[in-house]
Amino acid sequence: DVLNIFESAIDLMSFQTLEKLHKRNWKKNNYLSLSGVTAIGNSIEESELPIALGKFLAINPQIKVLNLYLDNDKAGKNSIAKINYLLGKSYQIYDKGPKKMKDVNEVLTRKFKQKEEYSR
């Protein structure tokens, strides 16, 4: 099973909206918002798993793949490195966050702006 992980609830909902717009089955996977990533730790060696992520994985042993949709900024990149450090031996982990925009919500809002411009 797959767990899609987001930095915020708005990014999670934006992702589900994008999936629905593309007519993909967004209900088949699991979703989790970390509600921010700054509490993960100062260094990789001191890192602790976010509580929500640890609990979710503990009660869902069928999860094998973690798709990270964290923000395209320093905090997001640091969090990706820390999650890889803590869980990389137990899970397949993929960085699927936006590469040219700040976050998933920006991807969605730009998509709607483009549609609006085309309809004029």
Predicted regions and their residues:
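TOPRIM fold recognition
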Residues: 19-120
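Helix N-cap/beta->alpha junction signal
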Residues: 7-8, 72
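Conserved Rossmann-like nucleotide-cofactor binding loop
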Residues: 11
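Short active-site oxyanion
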Residues: 1-4, 65-66
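A short glycine-/small-residue-rich loop at the edge of a beta-strand within enzyme catalytic domains
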Residues: 3-6, 44
